[in-house]
């Protein structure tokens, strides 16, 4: 028995030596890339890959998810090369004893891919009711606290719109939706929204689309506020909020193309940077609702 025990110990120790030798040879094949070069390489990767690569190591997870300069570079890159007609399709299923229905947001792109997101669960128990008219989800970023938040605004059916607001903070240990006070009641958001410098901006209506006003939601303080806006934005349905060189802007395209920019958030002063008539027909606009179809026909006449 002692002899067998000695042979067994010898085999184990020899195997360990071989593993150490193999491990040493394998390590010698790898190149030790400096951290600053690794960061620059990661900055070139798509956002989808960066999310996956957070699992490589704690160091990579910290770089990708917490380093301010790294996050700013990714945001700047996405602003320089924005994706065309991109949106997210979110589907939520609610079932009760009486009814079962689906709620979904509509994507603008025609190439739709339906995927599930592990870990992203919206618990609407106690909030979704039979009188629910609609709801919107808006993604925002607070550059001061370096936090990402999702704001959900629910609208119920009544003679006037009734609002309830909930906020979810990404990477919050509690992982729950918080009910926050909606400071502007009786309004219906008119998307798309835009997040600039820690504030979410969106157009809203309180009379089913007859007149509009501009609303801001401060991502850090989680408070709503009215924003002064030019008459063209208030009166026109055919306008879109944009991020214009880091400032809030909107494009109107009803009878002419115009771009307005809010120079200062505190003073809420606007200036018109583009004003061009399109009455001669050189530019043709298509309603975004028809882009969902496989084929779109544009008929025009050249004299």
UniProtKB/Swiss-Prot annotation:
<dbReference type="InterPro" id="IPR036047">
    <property type="entry name" value="F-box-like_dom_sf"/>
</dbReference>
<feature type="domain" description="F-box">
    <location>
        <begin position="27"/>
        <end position="74"/>
    </location>
</feature>
<dbReference type="InterPro" id="IPR013187">
    <property type="entry name" value="F-box-assoc_dom_typ3"/>
</dbReference>
<dbReference type="Pfam" id="PF00646">
    <property type="entry name" value="F-box"/>
</dbReference>
<dbReference type="InterPro" id="IPR017451">
    <property type="entry name" value="F-box-assoc_interact_dom"/>
</dbReference>
<protein>
    <recommendedName>
        <fullName>Putative F-box protein At5g62060</fullName>
    </recommendedName>
</protein>
<dbReference type="InterPro" id="IPR001810">
    <property type="entry name" value="F-box_dom"/>
</dbReference>
<dbReference type="Pfam" id="PF08268">
    <property type="entry name" value="FBA_3"/>
</dbReference>
């Amino acid at each position: 028995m002692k002899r067998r025990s000695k042979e067994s110990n010898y085999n184990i120790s020899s195997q360990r030596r071989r593993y150490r030798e193999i491990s040493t040879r394998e390590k010698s094949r790898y190149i030790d890339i400096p951290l600053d070069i690794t960061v620059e390489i990661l900055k070139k990767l798509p956002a989808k890959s960066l999310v996956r690569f957070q699992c490589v190591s704690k160091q990579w997870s910290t770089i990708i998810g917490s380093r301010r300069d790294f996050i700013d570079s990714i945001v700047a890159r996405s602003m320089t090369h924005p994706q065309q007609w991109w949106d997210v399709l979110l589907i939520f299923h609610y079932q009760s004893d009486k009814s079962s229905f689906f709620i979904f947001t509509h994507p603008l792109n025609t190439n739709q891919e339906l995927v599930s997101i592990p870990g992203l669960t919206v618990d609407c128990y106690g909030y979704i009711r039979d009188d629910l008219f609609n709801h919107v989800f808006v993604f925002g970023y607070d550059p001061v606290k370096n936090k990402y938040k999702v704001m959900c605004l629910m609208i119920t059916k009544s003679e006037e719109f009734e609002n309830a607001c909930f906020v979810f903070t990404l990477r919050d240990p509690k992982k729950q939706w918080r009910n926050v006070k909606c400071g502007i009641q009786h309004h219906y958001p008119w998307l798309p929204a835009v997040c600039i410098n820690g504030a979410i901006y969106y157009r809203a209506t309180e009379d089913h689309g007859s007149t509009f006003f501009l609303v801001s939601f401060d991502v850090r303080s989680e408070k709503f506020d009215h924003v002064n806006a030019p008459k063209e934005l208030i009166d026109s349905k055919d306008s879109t909020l944009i991020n214009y060189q880091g400032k809030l802007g909107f494009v109107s395209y009803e009878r002419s193309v115009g771009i307005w920019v809010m120079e200062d958030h505190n003073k809420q002063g606007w200036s018109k940077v583009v004003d061009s008539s399109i009455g001669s027909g050189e530019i043709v606009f298509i309603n975004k609702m028809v882009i969902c179809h496989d084929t779109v026909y544009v008929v025009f006449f050249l004299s």
